[in-house]
């Protein structure tokens, strides 16, 4: 009956640890609770359980129910109650809402991350399935095929415009399908982007409870009694003490000694014995090994190693020191017929003398990484701007284009060809503005560097022609003609190495203004930086190979009294009164005011072909016909600072850029190589030379490629003229 009474007072909603019933879950029958004492009422523990599960609002009804139950138990303690009495004794069941509020499901928040995973490939990289049509396997072991991705960018754009959920659609890497994020997931992403916590209910700034405060408490935090072992001596500590006592007795542990304040001086060489074995082995230098025998020492050497009768007689007549071999090679039919070596004892004796008398030296081997020997050069893309591609092609000449020159402003381009014409081009459009027929092969052309003078000098045959191109500003063209017409000839004519002649009216209509006639063909013409002096090179053998003409006074002079070889080209120094003269094997720098030789540069080339001076004036480059480009640093040495062998054939022309740290070279291999040449103001830092681009475009004609190169005065552009009759602009 006690069990029955207990059953009457227990309800499924009020049992401790009972799972809360779900709406679609059937209730289970609860086993009766057995009490140990039939005469006693509910225990304290049961009361505490009921008091914890029931709310305060139902205390009165519960007490009444308990009294009725107790009365029923006391009245009939030995008999069983009928079903009607049981129904009256059982308390009413609480509502579903009250049961849910009182009891909480302990598995409510339990979840598994792998319940919703359809791809069961495991923890393997999905990149393994890149080459397969499927992306994994489902729970049944069937393949999960990748969705067809046939949508292009236009479809994606239409989805982006039409689909309102496009911004919250992501791709599942496990299955390859598109997933739509819920509002909770979007809110979670927004919180994480703002640096907040993922749980919206988490308060990081909730008030802290200072459990262990500074106030002295009356009672301890934990009232656990002390262990029994705390009153007994520790066996572990006893073993440690025993081991320490034994170590002290054995002398393993020694007490600390006070430090000795007296300094100690040691004799570094007191312990060394020169006769000791270790001392001898330290300084031992192994003897050099004997050279291995060669083919000549074989008993059956090849026929070319056997000396002839003349060589044998010559060997016998030589002194022993002069002989290359101290024996004569002999041939024997077999090894058993080889006699004993007659000089064996002598050679052993000489070997012993060498080991005894000749000193030995230990050579320290230095291990050098080959990568450290290669200079660390910057990347070409870090050295921009420089020309990288072909921009324009100037077509019009019918033969070799030997020379070209750019106007000081960079708007016009002049070119000379073997077809006897001088053409003037517009740089921006590649349009031929003017064609002047001079009646001869133009070997060199130079535009006056003075921006206030519109004048071009061209060398053809044995004359230098000065012409006014009449392009650009009309005031500039008129002032140039007026400057040439204001010349008054001297009263007493002087003997000059060249003749200045006025052109005819027909030639004047074509643009020609003056003609300077020489005794030999002219190979080069170049202007001084101010535009008043003109230097020419003649193909003669005497001291008149180089002439200097003055435009304002129409005078010519020969600066040298004797010749130092065949002159190839000349150039004026940009800042100093120097004249640079390049011969076949050397470059000489002359001081024009002092009339003396300043420096002589040795390029170590077979034949110098061209030369250019850096705008700062402290560096020079020269090209040669043996495929070398030589860089000279005048402040460093008279020998080359660096030799570049990038071209495969002869170099025809070299040039510096007036503003940018660039220089270029043209060769017969049809290529133009542009290099970065940075010159620093710090004299302790060497120039930086880095090849940055190889420009190709000219076709080889008569085994000739690029004949001349020139830079644009303001832009990082380079012009090249070739044997194919074209001029190309690279930008």
UniProtKB/Swiss-Prot annotation:
Pfam families cross-referenced by the UniProt entry: BOP1NT, WD40
Annotated compartments: Nucleus, Nucleolus; Nucleus, Nucleoplasm
Protein name: Ribosome biogenesis protein BOP1
Stretches the record annotates as Sufficient for nucleolar localization: 250-412
WD repeat coordinates: 396-435, 437-477, 517-559, 562-600, 603-642, 646-685, 701-731
Origin species: Rattus norvegicus (Rat)
GO molecular function: ribonucleoprotein complex binding
Region (Disordered), start-end ranges: 1-116
Taxonomic superkingdom: Eukaryota
Gene this chain is encoded by: Bop1
């Amino acid at each position: 009956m006690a069990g029955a009474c207990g059953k009457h007072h227990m309800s499924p909603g009020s049992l401790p640890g009972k799972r809360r019933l779900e709406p679609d879950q059937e209730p289970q029958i609860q086993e009766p609770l057995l009490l140990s004492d039939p005469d006693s009422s509910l225990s304290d523990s049961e009361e505490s359980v009921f008091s914890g599960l029931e709310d305060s609002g139902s205390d009165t009804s519960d007490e009444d129910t308990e009294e009725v139950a107790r009365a029923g138990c006391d009245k009939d303690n030995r008999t069983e109650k009928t079903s009607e009495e049981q129904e009256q004794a059982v308390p009413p069941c609480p509502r579903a809402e009250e049961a849910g509020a009182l009891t909480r499901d302990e598995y409510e928040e339990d979840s598994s991350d792998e319940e919703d995973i359809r791809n069961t490939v495991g923890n393997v990289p999905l990149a393994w399935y890149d080459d397969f049509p499927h992306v994994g396997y489902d729970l049944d072991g069937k393949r999960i095929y990748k969705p067809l991705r046939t949508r292009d960018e236009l479809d994606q754009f239409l989805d982006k415009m039409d689909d309102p959920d496009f911004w919250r659609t992501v791709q599942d890497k496990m299955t390859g399908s598109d997933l739509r994020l819920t509002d909770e997931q979007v809110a979670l992403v927004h919180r994480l982007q703002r640096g907040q916590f993922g749980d919206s209910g988490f308060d990081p700034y909730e008030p802290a409870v200072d459990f262990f405060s500074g106030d002295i408490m009356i009672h301890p935090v934990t009232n656990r009694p002390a262990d029994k072992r705390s009153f007994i001596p520790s066996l572990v500590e006893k073993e440690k003490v025993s081991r320490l006592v034994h170590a002290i007795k054995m002398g393993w542990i020694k007490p600390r000694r006070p430090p000795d304040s007296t300094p100690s001086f040691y004799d570094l060489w007191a312990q060394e014995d020169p006769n000791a074995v270790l001392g001898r082995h330290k300084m031992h230098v192994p003897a050099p090994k004997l050279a291995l025998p060669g083919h000549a020492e074989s008993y059956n050497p090849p026929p070319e190693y056997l000396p002839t009768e003349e060589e044998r007689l010559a060997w016998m007549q030589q002194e022993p020191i002069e002989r290359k071999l101290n024996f004569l090679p002999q041939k024997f039919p077999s090894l058993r017929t080889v006699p004993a070596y007659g000089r064996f004892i002598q050679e052993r004796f000489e070997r012993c003398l060498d080991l005894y008398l000749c000193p030995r030296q230990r050579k320290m081997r230095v291990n050098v990484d080959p990568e450290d020997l290669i200079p660390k050069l910057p990347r070409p893309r870090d050295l921009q701007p420089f020309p990288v591609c072909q921009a324009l092609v100037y077509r019009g000449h019918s033969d070799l284009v030997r020379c070209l020159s750019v106007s000081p402003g960079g708007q016009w381009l002049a070119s000379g060809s073997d077809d006897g014409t001088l053409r003037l081009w517009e740089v921006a459009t590649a349009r031929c503005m003017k064609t002047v027929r001079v009646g001869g092969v133009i070997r060199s052309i130079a535009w006056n560097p003075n921006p206030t003078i519109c004048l071009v000098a061209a060398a053809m045959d044995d004359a230098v022609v000065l012409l006014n191109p009449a392009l650009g500003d009309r005031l500039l063209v008129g002032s140039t003609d007026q400057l040439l017409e204001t010349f008054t000839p001297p009263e007493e004519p002087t003997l000059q190495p060249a003749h200045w002649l006025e052109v005819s009216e027909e030639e004047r209509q074509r643009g020609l203004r003056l003609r300077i006639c020489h005794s030999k063909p002219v190979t080069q013409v170049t202007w001084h930086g101010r535009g008043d002096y003109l230097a020419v090179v003649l193909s003669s053998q005497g001291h008149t190979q180089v002439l200097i003409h003055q435009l304002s006074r129409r005078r010519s002079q020969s600066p040298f009294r004797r010749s130092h070889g065949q002159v190839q080209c000349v150039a004026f120094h940009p800042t100093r009164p120097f004249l640079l003269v390049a011969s076949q094997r050397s470059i000489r720098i002359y001081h024009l005011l002092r009339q003396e030789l300043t420096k002589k540069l040795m390029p170590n080339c077979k034949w110098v072909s061209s030369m250019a001076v850096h705008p700062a004036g402290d560096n020079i480059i020269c090209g040669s016909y043996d495929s070398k480009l030589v860089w000279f640093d005048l402040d460093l040495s008279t020998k080359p600072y660096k030799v570049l062998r990038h071209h495969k054939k002869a170099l025809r022309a070299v040039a510096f850029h007036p503003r940018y740290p660039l220089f270029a070279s043209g060769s017969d291999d049809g290529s133009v190589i542009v290099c970065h040449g940075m010159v620093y103001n710090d004299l302790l830092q060497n120039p930086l030379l880095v090849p940055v681009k190889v420009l190709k475009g000219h076709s080889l004609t008569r085994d000739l490629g690029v004949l001349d190169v020139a830079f644009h005065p303001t832009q990082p552009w380079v012009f090249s003229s070739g044997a194919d009759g074209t001029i190309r602009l690279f930008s």
